[in-house]
Structures are given as C-alpha cells and as structure tokens.
From Swiss-Prot:
An annotated GO cellular component: cytoplasm
Protein name per the record: 3-phosphoshikimate 1-carboxyvinyltransferase
PROSITE patterns tied to this protein: EPSP_SYNTHASE_1, EPSP_SYNTHASE_2
A GO MF term: 3-phosphoshikimate 1-carboxyvinyltransferase activity
Pfam families in the cross-refs: EPSP_synthase
Quaternary structure note: Monomer.
Lineage: Bacteria, Bacillati, Actinomycetota, Actinomycetes, Mycobacteriales
Gene that encodes the chain: aroA
Main localization of the protein described in the UniProt heading: cytoplasm
Family the entry assigns: Belongs to the EPSP synthase family.
Entry's Gene Ontology BP terms: amino acid biosynthetic process; aromatic amino acid family biosynthetic process; chorismate biosynthetic process
Its EC number(s): 2.5.1.19
Length: 430
C-alpha cells in the first residue's frame, strides 16, 4: 500500500540543492538508530543500570525512550547524546509507535513483563504495517493480545513461561529481533524458529545476537533457529556506532558528482547493513578507501566520471534500496535490484513509491516481482514525494544533486532517523 499526499494538506516543499561541480566534504554522522534502540531495550531489561554513549536523537529513538519511560523505566539524559538507564518493574502504560518499526515490534515482547495492560498505537501508516507474525508469536507464548495490527493491547498477567515459537519473519527480520531481545526474561527462555520464505535483513538479526551476547546472554544459532537461554541481562556501557545507512546518501553525493566524501569514524567490524555500501559503490565505479585516522578509520569515497549500473541481490540490505535506486536512476547503464519484495511492507511500499517518483522525473524504472529494473534515462525536475518515508526523502535529495529543479516534499520526515539532515546536506553542497 502506497500512501500519497492528501491534497487537502499542504506539506512543505524543499528545493533540493543542485551540485555545480564535484562535492568535497568531511562529515561526522550521528549514531545508529538500530543499535541505539536495541541498546535501550537491553538496558531496560537488564539487572543493573546501563550507560549509553553517542545516542542517536531522532524521532524513532525518542519514541523508544518515551515508550520505555511510559512502562516505568528511568532514563536520565546526562548529556544530549548520553543516557543513564535504570531498570525496574515494568508497569502498565501506553506506547506511541509513530512509524518506528523497532518500537512497534520490539516493545510488545517487553510489555509481556509489565504488571498491567500496555496499549500500543501509531501513525496512520503504521496501522497497515505487518504485525501479525510477532503478535501471534506472543500469543503462542501465553501473552494476551487483542488485535492483529495497531492499535492493540498487550496483557500478560504474570511472567510468561517461554518455550518454542514458530514465526514467519519473511516480511521483516524485526519480528525475530523483537522476540530475541526479550527472550532471556522468559522463565524458560525462548526458541525462535523461522518457518516462512527467505528471511530478509540478516545483518540486523546478527546485530541483535551480537548485542545480546555482549550483555551476557547465551544463544545457540542454527539455520533459521535461535535458542535463547534464560538469564540476567547485564547492565553495561554501550557506545553507539555512526549510522552507516544514514551515511549512504552523503557517500552517494561523491558518486553522483565525481567528488570526494569522507565519513569519520567508520567501524572496521560491524553488523550494520550500511557497511555494504562500500562494495556497492566500488562496483558502480567509485574509488573506496578506509583511511587510518587516530585510533580508528575514516571512509573515503571518490566518484567516477560516469556512474555504472549494478545488478545486486539486496535481500540482506534492503534499507539501502532508496539510495541505490537513486544512484541507478543517474547511472549510465542498466541496474537490477532484487530480493527486496519485503520493502512493500516498510514505511511505505518502497518499490511502488520509487518506481512512481523516478518515472515522474522522466526515469525508466520498472517494478519487478521482488525488486526494480532501472534503465538509463534523461531526468528532469519536478516534485519528489516522500510518502512520510525518511529514505524516500533522501533519495530525492540525491537525484536533486544531478538534476535541476527537483523539489522534495516534506524533507523533515528525515527526522525519523537524522534530525537536521537538510541542513547538513545544504552545507555539504555549498
């Protein structure tokens, strides 16, 4: 389902800056949303307090923080990017999910440990996002849930026993991660078995498993199965990596303009799907280099004279699709992006939305059963709709670098994961 703008509502239009030459810039990117929200969940369920450093402040992370506070967790802001989290007895409350998949899918299992009912709701678009898999899984674990989509109420009564749960997570890896994060608190732990089609975004599940192990939890993995043993989640200090997916539009600026972009503090070892942008840009003709800087590394990308298209299975890195699709629309040869049928259930139907917006600007994008075929075409200006989707908005900004008179509707939807994106972007373009 694609959400289009209501003609009765006037959304602000942002004139995407056009690059007049190669862009050269050195940038620091805020912390990872995915890691921040996982750290908040683990800190809330831990046996002792935790400190989270380099927290991302965005709509999604603020919704997670507010949701945990509504359940009785004390979260103290020691600095703008540093939180102290003190766990305690979870209480009845109300959670506003917005459009945050991590909130609507990670917090319902947490709510199973509250001493009363927990009500969930979100933005209108959130009410059609897939939720049945995780809610049915909670029911099979003995948790009462009164609906299959937002709004719904979770009411456990007493600490659930846990056990084996079968789940079809082919629509989103967040269904698996949501169960795994809370699994140690169930009396007998939880065994999660994925029984559906191909599981997307495996790096996000690997991120969840890695963070659980870092908090002292024992997990056994096999193909499409995770056995989480019951135990205390240890309080600790979490340091959040830069959000590599949010870095990709800026690296795309180098690719599009033949410039050089350097992203500070790029992690050498990471479970973030955004790290795949390095190999993608190399295949599209860019020079990509990790440059030693102090105790860490910066990532430097220099764009080519002519950007090449790419054929790639993006099933594990679906969140990069809007960035790669924007690059493909500006490339000199054909691109085929596959393995991303699950994007139809994201903030919007991203495949339909990308197809509509690229073609509206004169592009040649065809929606496939599980992806996109994008052929070279001469683009022109026009309004690029964001569909209240942060990554759709940044895709429009990328195209605007190379095409005159591109206007992005509701650029501030990027505040979901990157508040102030448009200011950083304009400063980069100069």
């Amino acid at each position: 389902m694609v959400f289009v703008s209501d003609s009765s509502i006037s959304l602000p239009i942002w004139d995407a800056p056009r690059a007049r030459g190669p862009i050269v810039s050195d940038l620091a990117i805020p912390g990872s949303k995915s890691i921040t929200n996982r750290a908040l969940i683990l800190a809330a369920l831990a046996s002792t307090p935790s400190t989270i450093i380099d927290v991302l402040r965005s709509r999604d992370t603020d919704l997670m923080t507010d949701g945990l506070r509504s359940l009785g967790i004390t979260i103290t802001e020691e600095a703008v990017d540093r939180y102290r989290v003190e766990p305690g007895q979870l209480s009845a409350g109300s959670v506003e999910c917005g459009l945050a998949g991590t909130v609507m899918r990670f917090l319902p299992p947490v709510a199973a440990f509250a001493d009363g009912p927990v009500h969930f709701d979100g933005d209108p678009q959130a009410r059609v996002r897939p939720m049945t898999s995780i809610l049915d899984a909670l029911r099979s674990l003995g948790v009462e849930v009164d609906n299959n989509n937002l709004p719904f109420t979770v009411n456990a009564g007493e600490v659930p026993e846990g056990g084996v749960v079968e789940i079809d997570a082919s629509g989103s890896s967040q269904f698996v991660s949501g169960l795994l994060l809370s699994a140690p608190r169930f009396k007998n732990g939880v065994t999660v078995k994925h029984v559906g089609g191909r599981l997307p975004s495996m790096p996000h599940i690997e991120m969840t498993v890695d963070m659980l192990r870092s908090a002292g939890i024992e997990i056994e993995e096999s193909e499409n199965q995770w056995v989480v043993h019951p135990g205390e989640i240890l309080g600790r200090t979490w340091r959040i990596e830069p959000d590599l997916s949010n870095a990709t539009p800026f690296l795309a600026a180098a690719a599009v303009t033949g410039g050089t972009i350097k992203i500070n503090h790029w992690p050498i070892k990471t479970t973030q799907p955004g790290d795949a942008i390095r190999s993608i840009l190399e295949r599209m003709g860019c020079e990509v280099e990790l440059v030693a800087q102090g105790e860490g590394y910066d990532l430097s990308v220099t764009g080519p004279v002519a950007l090449k298209g790419i054929e790639i299975d993006m099933s594990d890195i679906g969140e990069l699709t809007p960035t790669v699709a924007a690059l493909a629309a500006l490339a000199s040869t054909e691109s085929r992006l596959t393995g991303i049928a699950h994007l139809r259930g994201h903030e919007t139907d991203r495949l339909a939305a990308l197809t509509a917006e690229i073609n509206k600007l004169g592009g040649k994008c065809t929606e496939l059963k599980d992806g996109l075929l994008i052929e070279p075409a001469s683009l022109h200006g026009g309004v690029w709709h964001s569909y209240a989707d942060h990554r759709m908005a940044t895709a429009g900004a990328i195209i605007g670098l190379a095409v005159d008179d591109v206007q992005v509707e509701d650029i501030k939807t990027t505040s979901k994961t990157f508040p102030g994106f448009e200011n950083v972007w304009e400063e980069m373009v100069g």
